[in-house]
Amino acid sequence: MLFRSPGAGKGTQAKQIAAKYQIPHISTGDIFRANIKNGTELGKKAKTYMDQGALVPDELTCDLVMDRIQQDDCKNGFVLDGFPRTIPQAEALDAALKKISQTMDYAIDVDVPDENIVKRMGGRRACLNCGATYHIVFNPTKVEGKCDACGAETVLRDDDKPETVQKRLSVYHEQTQPLIDYYKAQGILKSVDGTKPMDEVFADIVAILGE
């Protein structure tokens, strides 16, 4: 499991880990955005919170994640990205894993200062059609403003705008930061410097997983 404040690069690293170890990448953010795009009731509820920079309530996330990790492709492991975000979610996850005789092996904290987060997220762009994500500095599109995958327009999402990012960071420090102590007490917390180049961050994570 990877966690940190929004924009710390968790998603990028989680996808690389999933590819290297051939395990599912489970991202609540992706699940919520898919539901928002499809106009589901869950998506409508989630969008209300996400647009305000607030965390989606536990009851809208826990059941969805618990169902996902019990699917067949998760039997050999999985990487969680963006969940749990609160102590109650972490406790619910531990309880669910215990029921299927599994435990969380690592909780990896991708450490990035707040000021870096605001700059990073301001450069994010997302495709209006397929949901692909880019960054104007770190991962730009081949044609400015156009998605490489489908050619549709790319935009700055509402939840990546500076004022929303500041709110999200405040929520993170209040609700998610305590997870550091929670997983430290379990002896599974590891930390990596998220300000390094992405390939170096990934190498540090692989080294941890190989311990």
Give a label for each model feature.
Residues 1-211:
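Glycine-rich phosphate-binding loop of ATP-dependent small-molecule kinases
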